[in-house]
Swiss-Prot record:
One BP annotation, GO: tRNA C5-cytosine methylation
Protein name in UniProt: tRNA (cytosine(38)-C(5))-methyltransferase
Major place of residence: cytoplasm
InterPro entries attached to this UniProt entry: C5-MTase, C5_MeTfrase, C5_meth_CS, SAM-dependent_MTases_sf
Organism: Schizosaccharomyces pombe (strain 972 / ATCC 24843) (Fission yeast)
Protein EC: 2.1.1.204
Length: 330
């Protein structure tokens, strides 16, 4: 029997609303009771697109009483990744930015209205951290059945590499399940072998002048860029440092039709017409809908790159939500 009851959701580290969009994409009838983030720009974008649901709050100050008052069946969270990134300081639980997540773990055993479902996302590398070890212990002691694993959008025929750790937890669940079960919910299962290309996500006509990579940047850092073409089937992970960092921050696009990129780069790199992806193109690759709006906000495109770099892949998470909530039979 299909469930007709709407799901009460608490969106922690809500950012620009990636989890909200993922719930919509998964066709889950949900009510976001509260979305919480400490970033005012992220909250501005969230509220512009979803109504005034996002609250500027410090998660490290929330108490068991606060969580009980929310009384939500699903908690979603994407804790700060900086303590665990390969280019970060890797201070793990000693990093002040881990305090909010540690507070959730400290408070959870004292919550009376425990959520039946929890979804956690973080960077690859989190799984080896002390924070992850504590997370597993707390969830197990609270009666959760946790599955976890590393997934990337390119496993779902999305031409973007963004490996992330995902943890899905069901309260008092005795059955067998696996993170690999997620593929039955994806389009990959229905469209075996179909590979999308970068061109499917590109804007068609606009003034590219402000997106072109400067000659001085190419001369100094050009060999560190990952250069892709419109017919490429993958591009690198876009991080919060895109457009002002080079290595590991995201790919750039070759607009010329030169076949041998390396040879042409050495001969005349400017002829390749290399440009940055626009924020809209990055948003598309990350699964956000065209309705995602920021032009009516005070958030600049430069800031939008940072917010997207901190966000989730909406499509991948929508599949994970379908897996997590499968027992509800929506």
């Amino acid at each position: 029997m299909l469930s007709t009851k709407r799901l009460r959701v608490l969106e922690l580290y809500s950012g620009i609303g990636g989890m909200h969009y993922a719930l919509n994409l998964a066709n889950i009838p949900a009510d976001i009771v509260c979305a919480i983030d400490i970033n005012p720009q992220a909250n501005e974008i969230y509220n512009l697109n979803h109504g005034k649901l996002a609250k500027h709050m410090d998660i490290s100050t929330l108490t068991a009483k606060d969580f009980d008052a929310f009384d939500c069946k699903l908690w979603t969270m994407s804790p700060s990744c900086q303590p665990f990134t390969r280019i970060g300081n890797r201070k793990d639980i000693l990093d002040p930015r881990s305090q909010a997540f540690l507070n959730i773990l400290n408070v959870l055993p004292h919550v009376n209205n425990l959520p039946e479902y929890i979804l956690i996302e973080n960077v690859q590398g989190f799984e080896e951290s002390k924070a992850a070890e504590e997370c597993r212990k707390v969830l197990r002691n609270c009666g959760y059945n946790l599955i976890e694993g590393i997934l990337s959008p390119n496993q779902f025929n999305i031409p973007n590499s963004r490996s992330r750790w995902y943890g899905l937890a069901r309260l008092n669940f005795k059955g067998e399940w696996s993170i690999d079960d997620v593929f039955q919910f994806s389009e990959v299962a229905q469209k075996e072998g179909e590979v999308k290309r970068i061109r499917d996500y590109l804007e068609i006509e606009r003034d590219w002048s402000s997106y072109m990579v400067l000659e001085s940047v190419l001369n100094k850092w050009g060999h560190q860029f990952d250069i892709v073409k419109p017919d490429s089937s993958s591009c690198c992970c876009f991080t919060r440092g895109y457009t002002h960092l080079v290595q590991g921050a995201g790919s750039i696009l070759q607009m010329s039709d030169h076949e041998n990129t390396h040879e042409q780069f050495e001969r005349n790199r400017m002829a390749l017409q290399l440009r940055y992806f626009t924020a809209r193109e990055v948003a598309r690759l990350m699964g956000f809908p065209e309705s995602l709006e920021w032009s009516k906000s005070n958030v600049t495109e430069k800031c939008m790159y940072r917010l997207l770099g901190n966000s989730i892949n909406v499509k991948v998470v929508s599949y994970l939500i379908s897996l997590l909530l499968e027992p509800l039979n929506f």
